[in-house]
């Protein structure tokens, strides 16, 4: 996969290479998916509505497929990338829209897996408030996202751990650097104050 100079999900190359790329860059991706799936099962009622916010190719939807089917629940995947829409492979429907401008129905479960870091920081608070307002009583919003690194030496250790994981997963050092540089101004990790 060619790394764009400025990261985007709007190229065919990124979309078609996404599932492999994300697992190379984030060696714990499948473990995190499994954890989210386990938690999510506890909040999907019979006939419920689930939003996969920032659904990409449908990873979360695929992992929840059996539960959704058994409980006759609806899944709506939301993602702004038309290229991701073209290759989406999960139950439910795909809506091509920025997550923060979509008109949500009241829902039982919202899942935001590695998505908030791509929402402008100035829009995050209102977006999260809106999601909370739309979440039905007894429902849940699962957020799994990148946080700003800690300051000081511990931050250095954690950054190195991330880089080592990518390298040990077989990602070329040049590609790791290209990807990090391409995220400038596009990916803004969540701060602890948010």
Locate each region found by the language model.
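N-terminal, positively charged/glycine-rich alpha-helical extensions of SAM-dependent methyltransferases
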Residues: 1-17
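Class I SAM-dependent methyltransferase SAM/SAH-binding core
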Residues: 51-101
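A conserved beta-strand element that flanks and buttresses the S-adenosyl-L-methionine
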Residues: 111
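Short alpha-helix
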Residues: 185-194
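Conserved class I S-adenosyl-L-methionine
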Residues: 142-168
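A short glycine-rich, Lys/Arg-flanked "PGG" loop and its adjoining helix->strand segment in the class I
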Residues: 125-137
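Short catalytic micro-motifs in class I SAM-dependent methyltransferases
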Residues: 114-118
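Conserved alpha-helix/loop element of class I SAM-dependent methyltransferases that forms part
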Residues: 28-46
């Amino acid at each position: 996969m060619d790394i764009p100079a400025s990261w985007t999900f709007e190229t065919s190359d990124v979309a078609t290479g996404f599932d492999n790329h994300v697992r190379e860059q984030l060696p714990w991706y499948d473990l995190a998916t499994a954890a989210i799936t386990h938690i999510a099962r506890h909040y999907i009622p019979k006939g419920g509505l689930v939003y996969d916010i920032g659904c990409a190719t449908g990873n979360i939807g695929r992992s929840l497929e059996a539960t959704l089917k058994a409980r006759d629940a609806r899944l709506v995947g939301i993602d702004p990338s038309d290229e991701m829409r073209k290759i989406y492979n999960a139950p439910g429907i795909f809506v091509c829209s920025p997550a923060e401008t979509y008109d949500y129905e009241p829902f039982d479960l919202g899942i935001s897996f590695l998505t908030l870091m791509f929402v402008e920081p100035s829009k995050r608070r209102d977006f999260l408030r809106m999601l909370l307002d739309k979440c039905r009583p007894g429902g849940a919003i699962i957020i799994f996202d990148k946080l700003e690194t800690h300051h000081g030496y511990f931050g250095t250790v954690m950054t190195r751990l991330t880089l080592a994981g990518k390298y040990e997963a077989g990602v070329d050092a040049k590609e790791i650097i290209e990807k990090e540089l391409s995220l400038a101004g596009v990916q803004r990790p969540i701060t602890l104050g948010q």
